[in-house]
Amino acid sequence: MDQRLAQLVEELTTAGEPQLEPGRMKELKKICRSSEEHLSHAYHLLLTRLHEEHAEMRFSAFQIVQELFSRSHLFRTLLVSNFQEFLELTVGTDHEQPLPPPREVAQKLRKAAIAAVQGWHEKYGEAYKKLSLGYHYLKQNKKVDFQDVHARTVAERKREEEKQKRLDNVYKEKAKRAEKEMAEMSQEVAGTLTEMENCFRLLLPDPFDFTVNSTGLEPNEQTSADEDRSASSLPTYVGCVDDEQPCCSKDILPISQCVRTDQNEELADKQKKPEQDLLDGDTCSEVESGVPVLGDDDYETFVRNHGLISHKYALDLELSTADIKVHENEDNTAVINSVADAHKLVRNKFLPSVQSWIQLFTRAGINDDRLRCAIDLKNRLEAALRKYKEMNISFKERKRKVMKASDDGDDDDDDEDDFVEVPEKEGYEPHIPDHLRKEYGLENCPKKDESVKKDSCSLTKTKQKNEDELDPTCAAATLKLIRDKLPNESATTEPAALEEPDSKRRKLEEERAKAPLMPFGLDLHYWGQDQPSAGKILKFTSEHRFWAPSEVEEEVENKEITEMLKTRYITFAGKFEPVKHKCRAPMPDGSLCERQDRIKCPFHGKIIPRDECGVPINAEDRAREEKMRFEKQATQPETEWRDPEFMREVEAATGVDLGSSKTNGKGGKKKGKKKYPNLTDLKQQANTARSRLEKIVFNKGAVKRVVKAMNQMDQRKHEKFANQFNYALN
């Protein structure tokens, strides 16, 4: 029974399932119910399982403990007597011994254990004093919040609080830096936005800005101007109506000048039309307010001149920005360049900075004017980017302009302002004529030919050209690259140049064929001449560093050096002869080796003559191969011929162990079977990016290679700087 009990506990705790198997659990309860000894034995088995470094095994063991705790007084007594150890293994009250992985199962175990302790205290707390003490110990000393869903311990809570405080401090510091940056950059951002808005207005005026071309008259001047215009435009207006000529918007009378006469009033009273009644009702308020009302004729004229059917409706004009396209020309190039520069600045610098400010303020929990100002800046920047996109600017083709250095004349003009005029000295002759040079004791100056002058001019020009080609910012460098890519012009002229000395070239080739060029030594180079004194050295009788008589110097000839000048090594490889024979050693698949090595095959050793079947022709070679074959068979294991699958079938049929478990195929290691395959493999779970990098970086071979490379670097440095005191100590 004890063996069966241990087997059941092992199977239940190593199943790796979140719920216990009901059949085995029922059998375990039945065995524990049979005697107190079995129950005590089950308690010790479960306590051993709780000590395992695997959260799934502990969780399954805790579930068994929970089932037995609610059914047996003896089991409760045993568990409460060692309650502190139980809490350390399930709740993790000892921060030095945390719960083992997997982490999710460990968290689940802690929550279930805390809930179980709370339930046991409510149900059995009065009967078991140690249980009540354990509950209060968790609540008061370990500060375990039984209402906390995550069931965190004090150490975990403290760690999280400290981590949160550190994060808050970091975010506050970043928010302060962001506030400082915003205060420094806000003025620049506002200036850039104003510049973009002004450029937009210059490129495309706002259709709803009606005062864009107004002259800005003062009120008094405007009223007087209106009166003069109305007085002057009245006769023209009447004339236009009578002559039925096309009118202009400037000639249309304003509503205030359309005065209703008495005659019009009588006509209006006589005509009783519904539309006119509605019109009278609408204009009644205008009459009461003192504003002149239009008559019938004036109203019809007003409507006809303005192209309106009635003045009671409004027109909504929608201007689509999809068809807008601004083309760059000579007039707006400067404006477009300014807009493009400002757009690049906003897109690459200002908008990312503002977005980072908003993110930092949000993380730091700032909800005051700083966040509102940042959001306002972001909205304005995004609106400017949208407007730039809607403008749909088409740029002209831009050519690369290379900035060249200013000429010498320009430098002289700039530097002339820095010089002070000085009067010339008396008797100073910058140029002395040729007939007076003898009097001054000077030689005659040789006359330069025109060719020399031309050569000097060409040299200066080529020098300046070379300097321009070396300068990567100059256009000459670009032209040089293009010329290099083009086919060489001299290639076309080479055939014409080679046609002239064709006979000389043929003669040279014939002579070279007769007498090929070979390397030679110095003795052949100076053949028939005085040989160089390479082997002679000066010998000093005195070995003192400073005091040595110069008269006693004597030359000593070193025979070894002179012999080295006259000796040479000539290697004769001979004529290449291709290999015609083959290895023809028998292969495992029955074929013959087709390698054509000259002396030795890398797989079958020295090449020997064989027949068509691969059998050695010489008797000695045959005897040697037979001996090697017997030795190889003796060293091979006896089980090589056995097939593991066939042996397992024979074992299953006969029931006799033929040793199939000992064989593991050809040349392979026997894989270790997992002890508990249903549990989560902790080693496989730890296969993270960090662990994989650790395997590669801290591999023994890699560490050895790194150490070897570093030692070589140190050795090279030591050899290079060994005589310097600064590096000798390193």
Curated annotation (Swiss-Prot):
ZnF UVSSA-type: positions: 580-607
Residue span of region Disordered: 213-232, 399-421, 485-509, 656-679
Binding site for Zn(2+): 583, 593, 601, 604
Primary localisation category: nucleus
Domain of life: Eukaryota
Polar residues: compositionally biased ranges: 213-223
Subcellular location(s) of the protein: Chromosome
Region of interest: VHS-like: 2-145
Coiled coil feature spans: 155-199, 369-401
Pfam families cross-referenced by the UniProt entry: DUF2043 (PF09740), UVSSA_N (PF20867)
Post-translational modification summary for this protein: Monoubiquitinated at Lys-425 in response to transcription stress; this promotes efficient transfer of TFIIH to stalled RNA polymerase II.
Covalent crosslink: Glycyl lysine isopeptide (Lys-Gly) (interchain with G-Cter in ubiquitin): 425
Acidic residues: compositionally biased ranges: 408-421
Keyword terms, alphabetized: Chromosome, Coiled coil, DNA damage, DNA repair, Isopeptide bond, Metal-binding, Ubl conjugation, Zinc, Zinc-finger
GO CC term (a single one): nucleus
Stretches with biased composition (Basic residues): 667-676
One GO term of the biological process aspect: response to UV
Molecular-function GO terms, alphabetical: chromatin-protein adaptor activity; RNA polymerase II complex binding; RNA polymerase inhibitor activity
Family: Belongs to the UVSSA family.
PANTHER family xrefs: UV-STIMULATED SCAFFOLD PROTEIN A (PTHR28670:SF1)
Function: Factor involved in transcription-coupled nucleotide excision repair (TC-NER), a mechanism that rapidly removes RNA polymerase II-blocking lesions from the transcribed strand of active genes. Acts as a key adapter that promotes recruitment of factors involved in TC-NER. Facilitates the ubiquitination of the elongating form of RNA polymerase II (RNA pol IIo) at DNA damage sites, thereby promoting RNA pol IIo backtracking and access by the TC-NER machinery to lesion sites.
Name of the featured protein: UV-stimulated scaffold protein A
